[in-house]
């Protein structure tokens, strides 16, 4: 069972529950050697740091003394780990040696027998440089084994969860096919396999595309494991692309070669020995100088270096979790991807997939938008803004430029004449910013440095396309000046209240429909904050309809605002339909759980304001969705939406 608690980009801070044990994602599974004598780092440290580990059931199976202990006392006792134990099935050995001495069903039976929490099918790992024919043949065999493994578990009543590995080599259509076929089977976790050769060759562009083409066709309610990814420099990007789990033997393997892991890359202990101190404050790096560690006996040096590598690996995972909570994962990704040019290639290629990524990215975040480089132009916040500009119902449009020194929000720093013309400011980062919505996230909640000329020109084509699309509504400067002069001479009773006009446009941008019709425009009133002077509420006959949330200026409905949205928005827009059995809980303002969602607006994005209705479209409650439209239909565990209030009968 998998539940999302917080999110940013496609990264998910979640909880996986297996056999009553909980794993917080994203996380790393240290690779544990099933033979305790060959384990580099003590299990006391592993138990302290990790919720989950991965070990090899094939080595256990083929080593008589290990097999005997595992079969009599269980895998947890063998490796001395009490929480979740995942096992590989021998696929790695198959990829290295070309053959294994165990059958697909035999290894499933063994993993169940030794009490594994999550087992793995004996799939066929297919490297990146094989022919297409070979990749297709291997994939068909993996499908057969996967189907047989699921059948075996069901027929035998096995309790172990199962990994269903996605294969397909470097062929993206085969990765898509693999995800589609495997995704329809009842697997619990979906590892993306055979990417280690790509990572070893720094082919991060291909790694990113393999992840995305797999994710696009996998069920959203199951965790995704990036098999063999153990270097912390790749974690942030992989999490942002939707990977929840990683496994690492790198902490030990790198230590044996004297390699010192950091979140930005790999250093060599020999090259560091003349430094006064380490660039790390973990227990090992605090107790030893580089020279002291380098001069230790080889076995002890390897152990301590492996401990550092493990510490820094978990430190990066914790940093990513915090970035998800704070809403600045993209900034961390951009920082990490600048640590190596090949990793930057991985970041740049994802712009091709922004239509997919945007569906999973929250509509609002705790942190503002920080522009850290040219790649920031392709972030989902900007992509979404450009799409949602078309939601606004324009009558007359005037497009203009402002000085680079003009502070945001623009409308507070320009001598703009209030009228019913939509004034759009050309913006180097966001393309076009309508003055009437310029306080909404992320249009005012951003920090951008001085840009190079080529960056300033990035959105020229977008602006030209917008002008061409709306050419009949575009006013030139002469027409605009004439119009505002004429408008200014109107009697006050004939003029539109600029605050109400502004709120109307904000509602169109946020909800995709005209919420304030002409009749309502004349009845509603705005209320400004006494402290800031900014619009704070929209009221109708002294009842609050909407409150403008201070941090992002989104319009948050109160009870009467929810009823107005329900009246103005066509079904199923901005709705979550729930089962009749929990109607009263919704009316009482209780959270909506995923298993009770019957239908929804499939275009919902995470953290949008939603209406909770029954199958007859009766309004029951209103609140905020945690999940997007696809997830609402696929998740069957955890909270789907938190409620702000219920509607009593």
UniProtKB/Swiss-Prot annotation:
Return the PROSITE patterns for the record: PUA
The metabolic or biological pathway listed in the UniProt record of this protein is:
tRNA modification; archaeosine-tRNA biosynthesis
Biological process, per Gene Ontology: tRNA wobble guanine modification
UniProt catalytic activity: guanosine(15) in tRNA + 7-cyano-7-deazaguanine = 7-cyano-7-carbaguanosine(15) in tRNA + guanine
Q: Does the keyword Nucleus apply?
A: no
* Origin: domain of life: Archaea
Q: What is the name attached to this protein's record? A: tRNA-guanine(15) transglycosylase
Q: Which organism is it from?
A: Methanococcus maripaludis (strain C5 / ATCC BAA-1333)
């Amino acid at each position: 069972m998998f539940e999302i608690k917080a999110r940013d980009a496609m990264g998910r801070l979640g909880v996986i529950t297996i056999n009553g044990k909980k794993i917080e994602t994203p996380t790393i599974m240290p690779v544990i050697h099933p033979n305790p004598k060959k384990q580099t780092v003590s299990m006391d440290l592993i138990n302290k740091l990790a919720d989950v580990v991965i070990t090899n059931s094939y080595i256990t199976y083929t080593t008589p003394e290990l097999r005997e202990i595992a079969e009599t006392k269980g895998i947890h006792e063998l490796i001395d780990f009490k929480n979740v134990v995942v096992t590989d099935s021998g696929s790695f050995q198959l990829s290295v040696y070309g053959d294994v001495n165990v059958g697909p069903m035999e290894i499933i039976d063994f993993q169940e027998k030794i009490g594994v929490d999550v087992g793995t099918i004996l799939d066929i790992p297919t490297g990146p440089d094989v022919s297409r024919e070979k990749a297709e043949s291997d994939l068909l065999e993996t499908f057969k084994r996967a189907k047989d493994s699921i059948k075996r578990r069901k027929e035998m009543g096995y309790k172990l969860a199962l990994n269903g590995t996605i294969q397909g080599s470097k062929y993206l259509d085969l990765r898509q096919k693999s995800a589609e076929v495997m995704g329809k089977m009842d697997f619990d976790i979906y590892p993306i396999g055979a990417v280690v050769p790509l990572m070893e060759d720094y082919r991060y562009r291909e790694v990113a595309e393999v992840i995305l083409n797999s994710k696009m066709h996998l069920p959203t309610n199951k965790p995704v494991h990036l098999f063999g990814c153990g270097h912390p420099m790749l974690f942030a990007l992989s999490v942002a692309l939707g990977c929840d789990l990683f496994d690492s033997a790198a902490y030990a393997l790198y230590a044996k070669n004297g390699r010192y892991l950091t979140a930005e890359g790999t250093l060599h202990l020999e090259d560091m020995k003349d430094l006064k101190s380490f660039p790390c404050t973990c227990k090992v790096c605090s107790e030893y100088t580089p020279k002291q560690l380098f001069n230790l006996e080889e076995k002890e040096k390897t152990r301590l270096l492996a401990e550092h590598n493990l510490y820094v690996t978990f430190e990066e995972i914790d940093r990513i979790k915090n970035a998800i909570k704070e809403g600045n994962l993209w900034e961390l990704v951009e920082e990490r991807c600048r640590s190596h040019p090949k990793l930057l290639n991985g970041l740049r290629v994802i712009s091709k997939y922004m239509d997919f990524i945007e569906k999973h990215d929250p509509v609002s975040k705790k942190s503002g938008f920080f522009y850290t480089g040219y790649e920031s132009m392709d972030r989902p916040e900007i992509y979404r803004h450009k799409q949602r500009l078309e939601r606004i119902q324009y009558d007359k449009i005037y497009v203009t430029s402002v000085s680079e020194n003009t502070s945001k929000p623009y409308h507070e720093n320009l001598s703009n004449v209030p009228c019913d013309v939509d004034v759009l400011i050309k913006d180097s980062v966001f393309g076009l910013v309508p003055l009437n919505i310029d306080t909404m996230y992320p249009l005012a909640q951003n920090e951008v440095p001085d840009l190079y000329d080529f960056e300033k020109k990035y959105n020229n084509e977008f602006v030209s396309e917008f002008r061409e699309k709306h050419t009949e509504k575009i006013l030139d400067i002469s027409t605009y000046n004439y119009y505002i002069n004429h408008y200014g001479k109107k009697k006050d009773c004939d003029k539109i209240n600029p605050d109400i006009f502004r709120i109307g446009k904000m509602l169109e941008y946020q909800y995709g429909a005209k919420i304030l019709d002409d009749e309502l425009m004349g009845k509603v009133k705005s209320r400004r904050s006494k402290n800031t002077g900014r619009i704070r509420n929209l009221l109708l006959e002294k009842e609050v309809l909407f409150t403008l949330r201070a941090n992002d200026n989104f319009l948050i409905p109160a009870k009467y605002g929810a009823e107005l949205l329900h009246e103005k928005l066509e079904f199923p827009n901005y709705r979550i339909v729930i089962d009749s059995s929990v109607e009263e809980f919704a009316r009482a303002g209780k959270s909506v759980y995923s298993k009770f969602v019957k239908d929804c607006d499939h275009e919902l994005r995470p953290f949008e304001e939603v209406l909770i209705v029954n199958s007859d479209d009766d309004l029951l409650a209103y609140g905020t969705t945690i999940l997007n439209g696809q997830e609402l239909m696929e998740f069957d565990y955890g909270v789907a939406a938190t409620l702000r209030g219920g509607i009593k009968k």
